Amino acid sequence: MEPVDPRLEPWKHPGSQPKTASNNCYCKRCCLHCQVCFTKKGLGISYGRKKRRQRRRAPQDSKTHQVSLSKQPASQPRGDPTGPKESKKKVERETETDPED
């Protein structure tokens, strides 16, 4: 390797930049022309800054939203409405009446 001038900034070192400038073309030839273009264009990986998304602000009338939630009917319990104790008794009765011997 050739010695690098220590006064040069690292991004200006020879070989630090691709020989041809990157462009916005996404054709196969441009996507595969160097490793940087392949990762950015071909694989879609970019490590740049991500823009912060603004969170949606709650409406000013937040109390009415709480009231509308309380008016909704309570969710129905799933499963056997009689309860788990009675269903166990049913299973016990069925096993007694069906002898497998």
UniProtKB/Swiss-Prot annotation:
Family assignment from sequence similarity: Belongs to the lentiviruses Tat family.
Region feature (Interaction with the host capping enzyme RNGTT): 49-86
Processing after translation: Asymmetrical arginine methylation by host PRMT6 seems to diminish the transactivation capacity of Tat and affects the interaction with host CCNT1. Acetylation by EP300, CREBBP, GCN5L2/GCN5 and PCAF regulates the transactivation activity of Tat. EP300-mediated acetylation of Lys-50 promotes dissociation of Tat from the TAR RNA through the competitive binding to PCAF's bromodomain. In addition, the non-acetylated Tat's N-terminus can also interact with PCAF. PCAF-mediated acetylation of Lys-28 enhances Tat's binding to CCNT1. Lys-50 is deacetylated by SIRT1.
Keywords per UniProt: Acetylation, Activator, AIDS, Apoptosis, Host cytoplasm, Host nucleus, Host-virus interaction, Inhibition of host innate immune response by virus, Inhibition of host interferon signaling pathway by virus, Interferon antiviral system evasion, Isopeptide bond, Metal-binding, Methylation, Modulation of host chromatin by virus, Modulation of host PP1 activity by virus, Phosphoprotein, RNA-binding, Secreted, Transcription, Transcription regulation, Ubl conjugation, Viral immunoevasion, Zinc
Alphabetical list of InterPro entries matching this protein: IV_Tat, Tat_dom_sf
Subcellular location as annotated: Host nucleus, Host nucleolus; Host cytoplasm; Secreted
Site (Essential for Tat translocation through the endosomal membrane): W11
Subunit structure: Interacts with host CCNT1. Associates with the P-TEFb complex composed at least of Tat, P-TEFb (CDK9 and CCNT1), TAR RNA, RNA Pol II. Recruits the HATs CREBBP, TAF1/TFIID, EP300, PCAF and GCN5L2. Interacts with host KAT5/Tip60; this interaction targets the latter to degradation. Interacts with the host deacetylase SIRT1. Interacts with host capping enzyme RNGTT; this interaction stimulates RNGTT. Binds to host KDR, and to the host integrins ITGAV/ITGB3 and ITGA5/ITGB1. Interacts with host KPNB1/importin beta-1 without previous binding to KPNA1/importin alpha-1. Interacts with EIF2AK2.
Domain notes: The cell attachment site mediates the interaction with ITGAV/ITGB3 and ITGA5/ITGB1 integrins, leading to vascular cell migration and invasion. This interaction also provides endothelial cells with the adhesion signal they require to grow in response to mitogens. The Cys-rich region may bind 2 zinc ions. This region is involved in binding to KAT5.
Function: Transcriptional activator that increases RNA Pol II processivity, thereby increasing the level of full-length viral transcripts. Recognizes a hairpin structure at the 5'-LTR of the nascent viral mRNAs referred to as the transactivation responsive RNA element (TAR) and recruits the cyclin T1-CDK9 complex (P-TEFb complex) that will in turn hyperphosphorylate the RNA polymerase II to allow efficient elongation. The CDK9 component of P-TEFb and other Tat-activated kinases hyperphosphorylate the C-terminus of RNA Pol II that becomes stabilized and much more processive.
Pfam families noted in UniProt: Tat
Naturally occurring in which organism (per UniProt): Human immunodeficiency virus type 1 group M subtype B (isolate OYI) (HIV-1)
Modified residues (Asymmetric dimethylarginine): R52, R53
Keyword Secreted: yes
Top-level taxon of origin: Viruses
Name this protein carries in UniProt: Protein Tat
Residue span of region Cysteine-rich: 22-37
Chain sites annotated for binding Zn(2+) 1: H33, C34, C37
Residues holding Zn(2+) 2: C25, C27, C30
Gene encoding the protein: tat
